[in-house]
Amino acid sequence: MADSKAKPTKAANKTPPKSPGDPAKAAKRLSLESEGANEGAAAAPELSALEEAFRRFAVHGDTRATGKEMHGKNWSKLCKDCHVIDGKNVTVTDVDIVFSKIKGKSCRTITFEQFQEALEELAKKRFKDKSSEEAVREVHRLIEGRAPVISGVTKAVSSPTVSRLTDTSKFTGSHKERFDQSGKGKGKAGRVDLVDESGYVPGYKHAGTYDQKVQGGK
């Protein structure tokens, strides 16, 4: 016999579904997050003039360099271009010794912090008559705002062969007729024999004066 009692049904879920967030509140939240990110970016410390110079020399001649580390070659160039090397108190040898002393044993580069340590070492030798702090400041002044000096620019070199080929006063034959005394080209007149159809004998100095004489006689 079938059970006449009805099975209890599950209570319907009366919890209302989550409504989508208020667009105005979402926009406000995104705006606040954006402002916070901008404030964080603005709060990032600016590079000092010394660190800017360090980065300029660090990337010099190396397209893959990041500017955060400096090779020994660029370190020597910085000391030379910024006149840290004076040839008396500080020499190229001194610069190389300090670099080897500061960098790690297995490293070939130095960081900005190590760079500052190296400058402190050189400052003692470069400005012996000043206190340690004053000497460091003087060395920093030599470097701040500086950039690598570009050298090895090709210059024009004069040679007898080049002079002979370019000096128009030494040209002969038909080539000589293509230039005037100042070396300026005559254009078409120097390349083509133009026919004189004026009726005057070549070399006649009074060409074109006949009409003036006739009018003057009237």
Swiss-Prot record:
It comes from Rattus norvegicus (Rat). It is an enzyme of class 3 (hydrolase). Residues 33-45 have a biased composition (Low complexity). Predominantly expressed in mature oligodendrocytes. Belongs to the TPPP family. Homodimer. Binds tubulin; binding is inhibited by GTP. Interacts with MAPK1. Interacts with GAPDH; the interaction is direct. Interacts with LIMK1 (via the PDZ domain); the interaction is direct. Interacts with LIMK2. Interacts with HDAC6; thereby inhibiting the tubulin deacetylase activity of HDAC6. Interacts with aggregated SNCA; may have a pro-aggregatory role in synucleinopathies. Interacts with DYNLL1. Interacts (via C-terminus) with S100A2, S100A6 and S100B; these interactions inhibit TPPP dimerization. Its EC number is 3.6.5.-. This is Tubulin polymerization-promoting protein. Most of the protein is composed of disordered regions. Zinc-binding induces structural rearrangement by promoting molten globule state formation. The modification Phosphoserine is found at S19, S31, S34, S106, S158, S159. Signal peptide: none annotated. Regulator of microtubule dynamics that plays a key role in myelination by promoting elongation of the myelin sheath. Acts as a microtubule nucleation factor in oligodendrocytes: specifically localizes to the postsynaptic Golgi apparatus region, also named Golgi outpost, and promotes microtubule nucleation, an important step for elongation of the myelin sheath. Required for both uniform polarized growth of distal microtubules as well as directing the branching of proximal processes. Shows magnesium-dependent GTPase activity; the role of the GTPase activity is unclear. SUPFAM superfamilies: EF-hand. Keywords: Cell cycle, Cell division, Cytoplasm, Cytoskeleton, Glycoprotein, Golgi apparatus, Hydrolase, Magnesium, Metal-binding, Mitosis, Nucleus, Phosphoprotein, Zinc. Residues 2-115 are annotated as: Mediates interaction with LIMK1. One of its GO terms (biological process) is positive regulation of protein-containing complex assembly. Phosphorylated by LIMK1 on serine residues; phosphorylation may alter the tubulin polymerization activity. Phosphorylation by LIMK2, but not LIMK1, regulates astral microtubule organization at early stage of mitosis. Phosphorylation by ROCK1 at Ser-31, Ser-106 and Ser-158 inhibits interaction with HDAC6, resulting in decreased acetylation of tubulin, increased cell motility and entry into S-phase. Phosphorylation by CDK1 inhibits the microtubule polymerizing activity. Degraded by the proteasome; zinc-binding inhibits degradation by the proteasome. The modification Phosphothreonine is found at T15, T91. The keyword Isomerase does not apply. One of its GO terms (molecular function) is protein homodimerization activity. It comes from the Eukaryota. Glycans are attached at S151. It is found in: Golgi outpost; Cytoplasm, Cytoskeleton, Microtubule organizing center; Cytoplasm, Cytoskeleton; Nucleus. Residues 174-183 have a biased composition (Basic and acidic residues).
